[in-house]
UniProtKB/Swiss-Prot annotation:
It comes from Prochlorococcus marinus (strain MIT 9515). This is tRNA (guanine-N(7)-)-methyltransferase. Coiled coil: none annotated. Keywords: Methyltransferase, S-adenosyl-L-methionine, Transferase, tRNA processing. Its EC number is 2.1.1.33. Pathway: tRNA modification; N(7)-methylguanine-tRNA biosynthesis. The gene is trmB. GO terms for cellular component: tRNA methyltransferase complex.
Length: 209
């Protein structure tokens, strides 16, 4: 079951910047993968174990999940994962996070809240201004991964990304990344539930041009 949290709430206007990368990661020079809407963080933790040659930051709007996720990585001594609480757009718009934005090599938006009602579409995480912010920061050949079980949301996200004219859709056969780092093959809790329920999953990859 999806837990709705209004990302436009004034509670998310004031945010704590993410600490400098050299305070968060053992090796801050590694490429950075950002997971927007990371939920409990299990997806990123699994991904980080498959490839320790990347750093990972998860952003989640439900504070309790972030607190629990950071407790997990502290207890298990992960050296390349960090979780941050808040509205992703506000966090990445914060000038104190510029070094983080400049380090982004790939981003995943997996099973974001669909906000079905049209009047609530403005609450969806992928918005034109957010894609514009990311495109201005992401280097050429940086990647965006999306997955959802809602076809209308998939079409909306794809259109928003492609209309920026900064990204093009990448065919899976053209996806060339070390197999140990492959966000497509690592499943989130939501994805496991969807597959178990035999629902369809819509997914795609976009490359910065």
């Amino acid at each position: 079951m999806r837990q709705h949290v209004n990302p436009l709430s004034k509670n998310f206007f004031e945010i704590d910047p993410i600490p400098p990368l050299n305070e968060v990661f053992e090796n801050p020079q590694l490429p950075l993968h950002l997971d927007i809407g990371c939920a409990s963080g299990d997806f990123l933790m699994e991904l980080s174990l498959k490839n320790k040659n990347w750093n990972y930051i998860g952003i989640e709007i439900r504070e309790k999940l972030v607190l629990n996720a950071n407790l997990k990585i502290k207890n298990r001594e992960y050296k390349n994962v960090y979780f941050s609480f808040g509205n992703a757009i506000n966090i990445l718009n914060n000038t104190n996070n510029k070094t983080l934005i400049d380090a982004i090599t790939s981003i995943s938006f997996y099973f974001p809240d669909p906000w079905f009602k049209k009047k609530h579409h403005k609450r969806r995480v992928i918005q034109p201004e957010f894609i514009n912010l990311l495109s201005n920061a992401m280097r050429t050949r940086s990647l965006i991964f999306i997955k959802t079980d809602v076809q209308e949301l998939f079409e909306y996200m794809e259109l928003t990304i492609l209309e920026s004219l900064k990204f093009k859709k990448l065919a899976y056969e053209d996806f060339r990344v070390n197999e140990s780092f492959n966000p497509i093959k690592t499943q989130t809790k939501r994805e496991k539930y969807v597959l178990l329920s035999q629902f369809e999953i819509y997914e795609s990859i976009y490359i910065r041009i």
